[in-house]
């Protein structure tokens, strides 16, 4: 497992109608990146903040799925929240303490204006290589895709570690590895498959099973 993490979970909120949002738990991955399943709730809500009832339903299903496969609950969970985590930390702390589970919460922000250049190659207008990152305290800008020189600067991901015991270096490494194992393409993805699949589930919400854990990747 990556850094003794047992389970990775992706969360996203999609808009199906004006003002109507559906949260989804993209994926329950084990610590080696193998898919356990995904869960799409049918609970509609207003705004980007996931309702606590929906959160509890999602995480209950994830824990059951993990235990069904591994015969025990995960000891350490990492949550990747697409965009901003508007839910606040308190609910997560109470929920996972109640279940005796360590957790880390990481925001994966993809729509940012920042661009990166390799400091030793600026004069040649060269782009940084895939896997390079700039780290500032609990934040990191990560280049997760390979872009050819002179074709425009790649858009990094902004990773924000909101809670937990992992180092930001460990989080960067995990996100990069999870961006390399997308089974739906021969190319690597810009996003880790946690939030990549969550985003796809939201966009195809009408075509995936609701309120039941599934491992059928219809949305790919």
What are these regions, as identified by a protein language model?
Residues 1-220:
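Long, contiguous domain-sized segments
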């Amino acid at each position: 497992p990556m850094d003794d993490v047992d389970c990775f979970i992706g969360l996203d909120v999609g808009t199906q109608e004006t003002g109507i949002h559906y949260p989804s738990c993209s994926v329950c991955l084990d610590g080696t990146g193998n898919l356990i399943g995904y869960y799409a709730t049918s609970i509609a809500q207003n705004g980007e903040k996931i309702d606590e009832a929906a959160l509890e339903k999602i995480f209950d299903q994830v824990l059951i799925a993990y235990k069904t496969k591994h015969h025990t609950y995960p000891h350490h969970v990492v949550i990747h929240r697409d965009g901003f985590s508007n839910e606040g930390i308190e609910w997560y702390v109470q929920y996972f303490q109640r279940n005796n589970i360590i957790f880390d919460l990481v925001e994966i922000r993809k729509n940012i204006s920042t661009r990166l250049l390799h400091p030793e190659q600026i004069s040649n207008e060269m782009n940084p290589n895939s896997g390079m990152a700039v780290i500032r305290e609990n934040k990191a800008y990560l280049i997760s895709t390979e872009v050819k020189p002179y074709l425009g600067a790649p858009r990094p991901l902004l990773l924000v570690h909101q809670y937990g015991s992992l180092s930001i270096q460990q989080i960067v490494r995990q996100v990069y590895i999870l961006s390399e194992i997308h089974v739906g393409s021969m190319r690597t993805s810009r996003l880790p498959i946690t939030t990549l699949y969550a985003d796809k589930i939201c966009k195809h919400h009408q075509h995936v099973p609701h309120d039941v854990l599934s491992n059928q990747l219809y949305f790919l």
